[in-house]
């Protein structure tokens, strides 16, 4: 089961709230509804989806809100079987026109915006977003490389409405709109915002799972960054120690060690005897003196400058 399927399954079993059920149905029929005119049983209203959880929620909303005469069907194989998924249909047999009038949806109008009466409270807005996600939403798994949640729609006014609600003062999700393959999407790209959205639509278990996975992923990423930084530091230290050893070896070959001031000669001798030691290690090897890494580094810079000047004269 994908994470999208997990979220939709959780949403499909939430208790139906009759005060907000029409807000859900308003979104579902505007996004996935099909109006059939003049069938053998009269006008019918159908919702088609490839997600069984979405079909289940639609069935429950219709049966509990309208006690409607509902028929369900599943199309298997052929063109209906896309990416291994079947197409589920939920059809109202006798009350299509009543339901459309009730949710103020004119099937012959190009206006797909949801009326304000279905969005005039935070609870109704949450129900609307929940139904929109159930209808056309998807979300990447929390352990995927990139966080991404989206809701799609063919109608520009409807996508603008979804966008506006996601970004209003109640939710402030920072959603954005994009045009993708002849459809519009509203999307979120940060883990924190996706977690907030899942909480808003009451997918609480999925939100907690998402947060757990996100925290673990962030911890692994932090550990990897620290490990990479440590490895880089070790590499830099090893390269610096090698350069210092070569410089001190040059002084030895040029018979310059005995001419150095005693403090510098001690450090040069220690580096020659301990080519891979860190500056802190070298500081701890000097007997009778309390010398810090900074002190060793200061003396080493003087030695490197001497080598540089000798090389310059040699050229």
UniProtKB/Swiss-Prot annotation:
**DNA-binding region, residue range(s):** 278-312
Does Isomerase show up as a keyword for this record? no
GO molecular function terms noted in the UniProt entry: DNA binding
Listed A to Z, the keywords are: Cell cycle, Cell division, DNA-binding
Please report a single Pfam family linked to this protein.
HTH_WhiA
Q: Please, one GO biological process term?
A: cell division
Task: Tell me the protein family, please.
Answer: Belongs to the WhiA family.
**Role according to the record:** Involved in cell division and chromosome segregation.
Q: Which HAMAP family match?
A: HTH_type_WhiA
Q: What is this protein called?
A: Probable cell division protein WhiA
Q: To which species is this protein native?
A: Oenococcus oeni (strain ATCC BAA-331 / PSU-1)
Gene transcribed to yield this protein: whiA
């Amino acid at each position: 089961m994908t994470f999208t399927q997990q979220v939709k399954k959780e949403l499909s079993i939430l208790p139906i709230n009759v005060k907000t059920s029409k807000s859900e149905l308003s979104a579902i029929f505007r996004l996935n509804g099909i109006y059939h005119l003049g069938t053998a049983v009269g006008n019918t209203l159908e919702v088609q989806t490839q997600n069984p959880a979405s079909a289940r929620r639609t069935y429950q909303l219709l049966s509990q809100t309208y006690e409607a005469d509902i028929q369900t069907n599943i199309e298997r194989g052929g063109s209906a079987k896309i990416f291994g998924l079947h197409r589920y249909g939920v059809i109202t047999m006798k009350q299509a026109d009543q339901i459309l009038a009730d949710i103020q949806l004119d099937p012959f109008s190009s206006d797909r915006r949801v009326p304000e009466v279905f969005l005039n409270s935070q609870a109704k807005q949450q129900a609307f977003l929940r139904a929109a996600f159930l209808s056309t939403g998807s979300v990447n798994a929390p352990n995927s490389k990139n966080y991404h949640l989206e809701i799609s729609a063919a109608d520009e006014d409807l996508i603008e409405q979804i966008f506006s609600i996601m970004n209003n003062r109640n939710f402030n999700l920072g959603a954005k709109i994009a045009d993708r393959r002849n459809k519009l999407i509203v999307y979120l790209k940060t883990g924190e915002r996706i977690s907030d959205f899942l909480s808003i639509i009451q997918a609480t278990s999925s939100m907690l799972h998402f947060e757990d996975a996100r925290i673990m992923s962030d911890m692994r990423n932090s550990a990897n960054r620290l490990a990479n930084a440590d490895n880089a530091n070790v590499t830099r230290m090893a390269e610096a120690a090698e350069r210092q050893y070569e410089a001190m070896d040059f002084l030895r070959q040029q018979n310059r060690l005995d001419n150095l001031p005693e403090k510098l000669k001690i450090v040069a001798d220690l580096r020659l005897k301990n080519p891979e030691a860190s500056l802190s290690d070298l500081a701890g090897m000097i007997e009778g003196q309390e010398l810090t890494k900074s002190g060793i580094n200061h003396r080493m810079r003087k030695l490197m400058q001497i080598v540089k000047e000798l090389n310059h004269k040699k050229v």
